Amino acid sequence: EMGVRVDPDNAVIHVDGMRLELRSDVEHLALNKPRGVHSTMSDDRGRPCVGDYVADRAQRLFHVGRLDADTEGLLLLTNDGDLAHRLMHPSYRVLKTYLAEVPGPVPRSLGRTLRAGVHFDDGPVAVDGFRVVQAMPGKALVEVVLHEGRKHIVRRLLAEVGHPVLRLVRTAIADVRLGEQRPGTVRVLSRPEVGALNRAVGR
């Protein structure tokens, strides 16, 4: 309704089903984390860390989940605590997509095996999607999609079925994609991307 005043710090506005963020101090960023960088905002041992890439920003940011040091790719950073909590909470089943280079060849049956579930001491894990992207001499590039957030879970899954990871890159979280973003760069998420994250967690 035109002429209605709202409190930008507390109001929740939706336009055509998309949540609009009114607070000017809220940031949503995407980092393409390089290999060897630790998923911490500071490191007392002086190792490269995620915080190095956003040290010049005024807002206090935190990373949404983690990637281990040897894993590359998409890592979200924000000061929106509620959104970050929801994205990490297993009940929202937010999908994450990975590209993994593994020893090959990869049998056609592997996708069925991973979708059916693999049992570990800390419980079973099943992928939401799996496909072979490229077959190469002695190795293969595979895509793994899953909502599970357990530590090292992609590496554990593929090692368990006989294809230990040689290289791992996270390429998407929900509908936010890494695309052609260069390693070590940070970009601001677009309004549609933020809207997609909000929808993924029921906001």
For each predicted feature, which ranges?
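Basic, flexible Lys/Arg- and Gly-enriched helix-loop patches that mediate nucleic-acid binding at interfaces
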Residues: E1-R203
